[in-house]
Amino acid sequence: MPDSARLTAYSAVSTSLALHSDRRLGELVDAALPLGSGIGGRSALLEVGGKPVFVKRVPLTEVERLPEHARSTANLFGIPTFCQYGVGGGPGFGAWRELAVHTMTTNWVLGGEYEGVPLMYHWRVLPGTAALPEELADVERVVAYWGGSPDVRRRIDALQQSTASLALFLEYIPRTLDEWLTEQTEAGEEGADRACSLVERELEAGTSFMNARGLLHFDAHFQNILVDGRRLYFADYGLAISSRFDLAPSETGFFERHRTYDRCYTRSWLVNSLITKVYGYGREKREALIRACAAGEEPPDGPQKARAVLSRHAPLAAVMTDFYVKVQDEDRETPYPAEALHRALQADRTRRG
């Protein structure tokens, strides 16, 4: 059953927001406390009936606002599928896809199927948008990074010229998993062990649930996952892709090849994150330790559960980390190592018993 307090808040906040005119809602959003801006849009904190609400404003291009494209989950700009990896400042795949995923995930909570996602109370198209984020400001650099794609250029130009945004009014969960895991590992071995158990369990449960329903998050790093100390909440769906979207044939094939992506990505991120937080290693030493543990070496002294996680998932993390280094630093079209990761997942299950 869904949490009754969450449902009560949802009912009150969603009704209150729905009763505002576009003009009044725009005024409230403009007066909200700014939290930041980035490649996915601007964010702010709004209070509605004493309840904090996270507002994300996603740029909405003129192409997306055309009547024939309203609410479309198609890849309207023909963005190459390798931009799903989100490295190097990707152009994104459109606001309507993000809205569709929020609608899907909110219904999971309301239907009592799954609690580990933030609720969307309301959405609205509002006038006004922001300048291109820093990651996209150097258009020539971004286009060159993505192989000179004319579709990437067209998308960035459209973002630059947009005059409206999709405002998403979301449940506010203030702490990221990255922040929380840092706190827990610094609090001592007992706290670190409890945190490792919770995170490993919740990552598995969340990715399995989403993937079984045809949704790949594709950007579940630990600043896009929120935590309240009891469970994790998978947030920020700017790169999410669903088998229920209006996919091009190339996207359908890409989706099928990447069905293991979320599980591998989150486990690899956990390994890399623990090495950084427990041992203080930078990239070079971190990657060396992953390779050593993957080859069978014991991790250095540290919290027992953290060491167990490293030993268990290092072989998978070694494959995934190597793939990401190649995508980020060498070739955006590096083939996804699906077979090697499948074998690593099978071995993972064996090690867990």
What residue ranges belong to the model's regions?
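Activation-loop N-terminal segment of eukaryotic-like protein kinases
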Residues: 227-230
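C-lobe/activation-segment region of protein kinase-like
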Residues: 233-344
